[in-house]
């Protein structure tokens, strides 16, 4: 479950208006699988506030984040992705990660940020709905897939209502829960009681 660089550290981007529900399945279960989760914000030590009003103090400043020190960058959605270009540095960092062969996972509003950055122009992807991304003026509409979550190489995308499918694709890319991902998904997505025994067997 280590990246090609040998690290098991997963970096979670945090910023004001972050959508709290979108990344919890992924981060909690990656931590249970042995990954270290570190938060990355605009400024290290300067709190950000989520949609729920929860304050998070980032471990690391975005400027100090290097792809070679990471197994994965997760970009949660946030209202600020639809309010201007304040979060553009995060999608620029996503480009640096992808250029370095390090995976990026983006959900909800973060997919619009990737679209504006041009990172969806030639990759299969999804989001909330196709016309949400079309409004960005991006050139990748032909690669839009109407699915819960989509993994194309090192890029994972999902819409805001699919945090479980989003997590499943992240696990698959990092090789977590081999042989148990289907049971995990059925338990948390479908509330299948039989999956509990499979997951914990």
Task: Describe the residue ranges of each PLM region.
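Active-site-adjacent pocket-lining segments in enzyme domains
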Residues: 2-19, 28-42, 59-105, 109-201
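Short gly/ser/thr-rich secondary-structure transition/capping motifs
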Residues: 52-60
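Membrane-interfacial amphipathic helices and adjacent loop/beta segments
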Residues: 39-40, 45-51
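Short N-terminal binding/cap micro-motifs at the start of the first secondary-structure element
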Residues: 18-23, 47
């Amino acid at each position: 479950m280590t990246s090609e660089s040998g690290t098991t550290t997963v970096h979670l981007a945090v910023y004001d208006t972050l959508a709290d529900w979108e990344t919890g399945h992924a981060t909690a279960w990656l931590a249970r699988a042995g990954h270290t989760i570190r938060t990355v914000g605009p400024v290290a030590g300067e709190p950000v506030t989520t949609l729920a009003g929860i304050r998070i103090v980032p471990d690391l400043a975005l400027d100090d984040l290097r792809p070679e020190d990471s197994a994965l960058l997760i970009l949660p959605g946030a209202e600020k992705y639809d309010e201007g270009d304040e979060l553009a540095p995060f999608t620029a960092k996503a480009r640096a990660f992808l250029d370095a062969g390090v995976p990026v996972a983006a959900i909800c509003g973060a997919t619009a940020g990737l679209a504006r950055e041009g990172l969806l122009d030639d990759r299969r992807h999804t989001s909330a709905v196709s016309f949400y991304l079309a409004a960005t003026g991006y050139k990748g509409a032909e690669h839009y897939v109407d699915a819960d979550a989509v993994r194309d190489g090192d890029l994972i995308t999902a819409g805001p209502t699919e945090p479980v499918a989003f997590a499943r694709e992240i696990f698959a890319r990092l090789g977590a829960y081999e042989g148990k991902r289907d049971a995990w998904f059925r338990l948390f997505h479908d509330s299948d009681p039989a999956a509990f025994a499979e997951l914990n067997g």
